[in-house]
Structures are given as structure tokens and as C-alpha cells.
Amino acid sequence: MCSDEFYALGKAETQCLGMPGLPIAVVPHPVAKLVPDEVATIARNVVDEVIRLWQDDAEALRAEFKEKAPPTKSRLRYRSMFEGNFSAPDAPERLNGPDDLEGVNRLFYSRGWTDGLPIIPPTPERYEKMLGNRGLDPNELLARIEPRQGEATVAKVAVNGVMAGCQPDHLPVLVAAAKALGHSDLNLKALNTTTHPCTVLALISGPITENIDVNTTYNVMGQGSLANAAIGRGIRSILLNIGGGTPGILDRATMGTPAKYSFCFGENLAENPWGETLAMERGFGAEQSTITLCGVEGPHNVNDHYGKTAEEILQTISGTMCSPGLNNSYLGGEIMLVLGPEHAEIIHKDGFSKADIKNYLIENAFIPAHVLSEPQRVIMRQYVPERLLADGDGGAKIATSHDDIQLVVAGGAGRHSAVIPSFGNTRAVTEVIRS
């Protein structure tokens, strides 16, 4: 059963599960937070249909619902994610397409195989160049990518990398990213289908940041770096073409975020006063190159040009972290703090360790009582009761343990940092990049 607005998602999910004829009872949208009388009316109106779906001939129902197409309300006129999809198990290895760049892009766009921007045609020559002589098995299965359970083989990852504009030396990063995407802690099925405006952030650490020129300094989350832009876009291409995250079908983000095009940057170890990256904090060696994937929103800037002490800067950061509209406020989960080098240096000079920073934020970063609505309190009591403060204040903590806060140093000069909230019901995953 699902609401009419999300019938397309329900239909696509039945296909993902290998049951394209699974009957779906439809109720009017929206259904969230209806009063009991409204729920009763909807139930009365749908009960006959539910009985029919339970009792009618199973084969006839399968045939009926296999052919029943979802209404298309979006202006995006993509083909079905399962029609002519080059990542389907029975898809041909090669597609004979137009000879000109514009024609290829029109074809790929019409089939829903792009992010909307022009792609590099994945010709056999470009594919072979991407694979190189690394000894990789093109048929090796790296992961199954949710929600479509698409098979992310080395070959498919390489093809999507070509399309995104990646260079051959970016492929090991994409291979590691594909493995991380398949980890259950990331909860990719939710990230790739939710109405929340989240994306997959890729944080690159270790020697490879210099080897392939990953930007770790000025404009670190912005445009200008081929490695950052192309690797992040390659991950999005994998989520779309292998995972099935087609906007308006399985990807049901209400607003979305520009970070869904590409969100990839590197840790700035050279200007990290603690000499420890997030990857090292997670148990990896300084000599290892890694990629950490996180399910996040876009970054929220922290502008503090006037704080002279660690506590003054951390107070500003605390306030930025504490918005009642964040998923972290009522689902818990991780939240990332990316300290600009100047903020990091001031905090470090005041004697704060990374653990001290986390302790400060746990104690001082809380959502004030007056901005929490009663429905929000109800949800928080249900999901994160440990975050609610004593009745005297009535506010709520944004973090309760060190594991809730990820500390990163990145960016260039200037008194700015960034808070990056997460989807909440997700955990970061780190994979070693093997050249």
C-alpha cells in the first residue's frame, strides 16, 4: 500500500525486488500526521480494494499490475529505469549510438543515464584506457548498489567514470567508493530514495590526495578541481545508473541539493594542527589512502572572524549545528564538522584536543526549548530520548557521544568552517584505495 504520489516509487521497488506484478493498493497523498477521523475515512475507502487484492486470482492481478504504469507528474520524461538500461543484467555490452557528441548526449539524457550535464561518451577506447594495466578483473563484483540492487562490477564502474570525466588514475578511488556504497552501515537504500535532500559525500585522505591532485585547500568543496569534481560526479553516476536513483522514480527528494551533482574533497593534513585525519582517527595509517563516504546534506557555513579563543569559536559552531529542522535533531546520527585551518589553529593553540572539541560540543550544542514544537518533542522522545534535556530547560542535545561528531580539517585561509549534517540514519564507511 502506498499513497498516489509515491505509486511510482512503490512500482519501482516491486521491480527492484523481482516482483513487477506485485499488487499495490493506493490511498490519497499525503498521509503523514492525519487525525484519526481522516485515517478512518481513508481506510473505509480503500478496504474493498485491499480485499480484492487479497482474494482475486493471483495470476490475473500480477498481469494487471505489471502493466499498470505510474502517473508521471514530473517534467522529467525519462524512460523506465528498466527499459533499455545499459546496467541491466541482460543488457548488451555495446550500444551503437550517434557519431556526434551532441547526439550521444541527447540519447543518454533521454534514457535517464546522465545527471543533466553533458557526458563523455564511453567508447571502447576510452573504457580500455580507463581500465589501464592495473590487473583488475572487469567482471569482479564490487557491491550491489541500492535500491535497484544493481551489480557494480569493475567494468560498470569504469564506464560510469568515463562518462563523468574521470581520468584513469581516478579509477582506484571509484572502485573503493563502489565497495563502500555496498556497506549496510551507509544505508544507501534510504539515502537514494528519501524525500530528504541528502547525497553521498566522499572524503579522500592520505598520499593519494597529492598523487591525483585532490583539492584540500581553497574552495575545497567548490568548483575548480578535476579530481574532486569528476570523482564526485562518478559516484553520482554509479548511484544513478547502477543503483537506479532516477529523480522522480526511485530518488524522491523533495528539494534535492546542488551537492548531488558532486560532493568530494580531501583532508588538509598539511594544515591540521593535530596531525591526525579522520581516516587515521578511524584506525587507518597515515601511509594509507582512503575514501570515506557519508550520507549528508549540503554544508552550512560557520563564519566567525571575531572569536579569539577556542570556546568563542566553538560557541559559534555549536549554534550553527543546532537547527530543529535537521534530521540529526530527531534521528540522531553523525554530524561532520570541517574546521578551516585558521579556526583549527586557534582551537589547538588553546590546548584543545580533538576529544576536547567533541566534549565541548556534546555539552554545549543543544537546540533551545523555544524553537522545538511539541510534535518535534514527540518524535524525539520516540527516537532519541537520551538527547532531551531536563524539564527545566526542555531543549535537546545535537550529540551525545564522540561517535556522533566527525572532525575534519580542510579548506584554505580565512575564518570559516563548515557544519555538514547527515541523513541521521546512516553511518560513515571508509575503504582503502588500492592503486
Range-by-range predicted roles:
Residues 2-6, 27-31, 207, 342:
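Short, ordered loop/turn segments at secondary-structure junctions
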Residues 17-25, 211-212:
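Short acidic, glycine/tyrosine-flanked loop/strand segments centered on an H-E-D-like triad
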Residues 79-435:
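Non-transmembrane, aqueous-exposed alpha-helical and coiled segments at domain scale
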Residues 57-80:
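A short, charged, Gly/Pro-tolerant segment at domain boundaries
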Residues 5-20:
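Active-site-proximal loop->helix
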Residues 1-3, 9, 188:
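Thiamine diphosphate
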Residues 27-65:
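A charged, well-structured terminal subsegment
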